[in-house]
Amino acid sequence: MPMILGYWNVRGLTHPIRMLLEYTDSSYDEKRYTMGDAPDFDRSQWLNEKFKLGLDFPNLPYLIDGSHKITQSNAILRYLARKHHLDGETEEERIRADIVENQVMDTRMQLIMLCYNPDFEKQKPEFLKTIPEKMKLYSEFLGKRPWFAGDKVTYVDFLAYDILDQYRMFEPKCLDAFPNLRDFLARFEGLKKISAYMKSSRYIATPIFSKMAHWSNK
């Protein structure tokens, strides 16, 4: 029976999960919920089902795989990574994966807080000044490695790709000074299953955020 992945009909937190499902050639169906337009941003499509799915902490995204019902995006990613042995082979790789996972969440939240802020246009110039240092740290951490944990693909490469790509959309020149990050993105996009997925009708590159955001690269 196919797994069921539930989320809004946007890129959002589920982009790395969708790509990992595709990369592992997993059998899954998507339940995509649609949010209403302004000013109400009606969420009844999701709210009508929220407490009927048997989820311990009802939220989006969720993944249902037989008797396993999982919420929290990183918990879903880690579950899939363990299932397909993409969570690092050595302690050093697992440590690096843990660091990147949490660093990506910080970097993502900073962009989210800006894009949903009513003062988006006023705060954007100052935010742009902080991007080079963020990218510099990712570049130094990656170094000459092909992947963020080491020599092999792990689940955190899906997270890292997603956030670096979002920042590249937000500020197209932000990776100009970091050739290893640009090479990483190209390497990831060149993975056979990922390349095929990105060309398919199932792929959602944008909008990144919900209709409530002031920037979503629509």
UniProtKB/Swiss-Prot annotation:
Entry protein name: Glutathione S-transferase Mu 1
GO molecular function, one term: identical protein binding
Ranges where the GST C-terminal domain occurs: 90-208
Assembly mode: Homodimer.
Gene: Gstm1
Disulfide bonds: none
Family stated for the protein in its record: Belongs to the GST superfamily. Mu family.
Sites bearing Phosphothreonine, chain numbering: 34
Domain GST N-terminal: 2-88
Assigned keywords, A-Z: Cytoplasm, Lipid metabolism, Phosphoprotein, Transferase
Its job: Conjugation of reduced glutathione to a wide number of exogenous and endogenous hydrophobic electrophiles. Involved in the formation of glutathione conjugates of both prostaglandin A2 (PGA2) and prostaglandin J2 (PGJ2). Participates in the formation of novel hepoxilin regioisomers.
A biological process from GO: cellular response to xenobiotic stimulus
InterPro entries: Glutathione-S-Trfase_C-like, Glutathione-S-Trfase_C_sf, Glutathione_S-Trfase, Glutathione_S-Trfase_N, GST_C, GST_mu, GST_superfamily, Thioredoxin-like_sf
Modified residues (Phosphoserine): 67, 210
Superkingdom as given in the UniProt entry: Eukaryota
PANTHER family: GLUTATHIONE S-TRANSFERASE, GLUTATHIONE S-TRANSFERASE MU 1-RELATED
Catalytic activity: RX + glutathione = an S-substituted glutathione + a halide anion + H(+); prostaglandin A2 + glutathione = prostaglandin A2-S-(R)-glutathione; prostaglandin J2 + glutathione = prostaglandin J2-S-(R)-glutathione; prostaglandin J2 + glutathione = prostaglandin J2-S-(S)-glutathione
Listed GO CC annotations: cytosol; mitochondrion; myelin sheath
Subcellular locations according to the entry: Cytoplasm
Binding-site residues, substrate: 116
Sequence positions that bind glutathione: 7-8, 43-46, 50, 59-60, 72-73
EC number of the protein: 2.5.1.18
Principal EC category: transferase
